[in-house]
Amino acid sequence: MVDDAKLFVHIFCHRQSAYLYEIQNEWDWMTKYFFTGGIMPSKDIFEFFDEDLTVVKSWQINGEHYSKTSKAWLKNMDKNSRIIKQILNHHYDEQNIWFYRWRIFFLTCEEFFKINNGKEWFVSHYLLKKKN
C-alpha cells in the first residue's frame, strides 16, 4: 500500500461481539454451508488491529436496511426460481436443497438484521489509511 493510499472497507458486524463461525452440531447448516472459516466482526474490530492502518472515519448503517435488501433478494429469487434452480443444478447435485438453503438464508438475514431495531447486527463502512 503506498503511503497516501486509503482503504474503504464494507462489513457486516455485531454491535459488541466478534465471534468465529464454527460448526457446533449437525443442525448448524448455515455455518457449514455459508460461513465456514468466517468471522462476524464487532463494530470496533479495527481498533484491535491498528499496527499498520488507522481508521480515519467510520459509518454504521442500520441493519433494517440490509433486512429489506435480504427480503427483496428472496422475492427476486422466488420470482426467478426456475432459472435459479437451473443455475444451481449446474453447480450442485442437490439443486432443490440449495434453493431452499438460500431461501432460509435470506429469511434468517431478514430477521436477524431487524433485531433491536437494526442496532444489533448492521453494516459498517470504514475509511482507513496507512499509519505514519
Predicted regions and their residues:
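Short conserved AdoMet
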Residues: 1-2, 50
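Short, well-ordered loop/turn elements at secondary-structure boundaries
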Residues: 2-3, 122
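Conserved beta-strand signature within the Rossmann-like core of class I S-adenosyl-L-methionine
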Residues: 3-13
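Substrate-binding/catalytic lobe of Class I Rossmann-like enzymes that use SAM or dcSAM, i.e.
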Residues: 13-123, 129-132
